[in-house]
Amino acid sequence: NDYLNKKYNEAVFCNISTTEYFERKDGKNYSFQDFTSNPHEYKSKIRNYIYDTDMLITGHYWEPKFPKLFYPNQINEFKNLKIIGDITCDINGSIPTTIRSTSIAKPYYSIDINSMKEIDLGNKGIAVMAVDNLPSELPNESSEEFGDSIMSEVLPYLINKDDGRINRATTASKGKFYPKYKYLEDFIK
């Protein structure tokens, strides 16, 4: 993984899956199905990625049975970490800096990495964005444009004869994936 092995002078990003940030405690191979069935057998290895990271944005599904991504006693290791965007907004969940939710009007707060308590903005600490309804936020203009596009570009072809666009956009029918989407079956097993 280049993100772990190279040094950069420009901004870069890394999008990782659970296979890259969780591992079995006993060293056996990772399996997503096993991970979801036996999360207690796994531990996080995301610290390898966060060590040189300036900004961490998480959007993973989490519930208390799953391991946390990192713990308060590890946060001092992340010398460059300045901002955490916790899209999941699980208070006291997988991200220990998410101690409360924020709002669109006031989207972030600062947290002291030693006490793990909220501090005044502008003080040394980590900025945390944890807007609990962020995944459902959609600007009015985008919503209107999306609705207009559905009305003009989709609905007529659902009601009348399809010119091929509906067929091309369909991933499954009658409980079966279309051939070009068969690879998705691996994600639901």
Regions found by a protein language model. Name each.
Residues 83, 89-189:
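Adenosine-phosphate binding glycine-rich loop
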Residues 1-52:
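Glycine-rich phosphate/diphosphate-binding loop of Rossmann-like nucleotide-binding domains
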Residues 61-62, 88-89:
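Short glycine-/small-residue-rich Rossmann-like dinucleotide-binding loops
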Residues 45-58, 65-82:
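Rossmann-fold NAD(P) dinucleotide-binding segment
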Residues 1, 65-68, 93-94:
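Short glycine/serine/threonine-rich phosphate/pyrophosphate-binding segments
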Residues 35, 59-61, 139:
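Glycine- and other small-residue-rich loops at beta-strand/loop junctions that grip anionic moieties
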Residues 11-13, 54-56, 82-84, 125-129:
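Structural motif
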Residues 41, 51, 70-73, 141, ...:
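Conserved active-site and cofactor/substrate-binding residues in soluble primary-metabolism enzymes
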